[in-house]
Amino acid sequence: MSARVLQVHEHTWTPADRAELQIRSLPVDVPRDVEALRIDLDVAANVGSVIDLGAQSPRGYVGWSGGARRQIVISAEWSTPGYLPTHGYAGTWQVLLGLHRVPADGARTTVTVRESNAGEVARLRALEPADPPVPLRPPRRTLPSSSGLTWLAADFHTHTVHSDGSLSVG
């Protein structure tokens, strides 16, 4: 039995679309009886196209995999790495597309959202590499902070013409 297709979005994105709004939301109405979701992103072969993928449930952010994945599955028990296991599917979801790189002649995408099931979730989970073991770590050092404030580690960086970006810093 094939999985029920809930929504198909086909679009050719242009540089003007990217300039207007870099992250696009594609709505998908998900009925109550859905056990799990599978989202497939097909980007037509076009040199220079980079389209990122993410998802948002009616309750909020579920995940983002950037341009690293073209298929994701979301269920209450397990979801593709980069996505939170999520339950309570009914309502309007958003498939998020990041228009990271759109060539002058456009980037044609087809997004297909299907109902999935426990068997498919287990099959896709088995294809993922096992989680690496968590290394033993020494206790964290404490840093001085004002009452109620906490130090957080962060990684501030940018992608420019000096690496894999297309814009300059200035």
What are these regions (language model features)?
Residues E35-L41, L84-A107:
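Noncatalytic modules at the cell exterior or secretory-pathway interfaces
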Residues R24, S79-G82:
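Short alpha-helical segments and helix-capping/turn motifs at coil-helix boundaries
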Residues D29, D40-D42, G54, L96-G98, ...:
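Residue-level recognition of well-ordered beta-strand positions that form the cores
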Residues M1-A44, R140-S145:
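Solvent-exposed, flexible loop/coil segments flanking beta-strands in beta-rich domains
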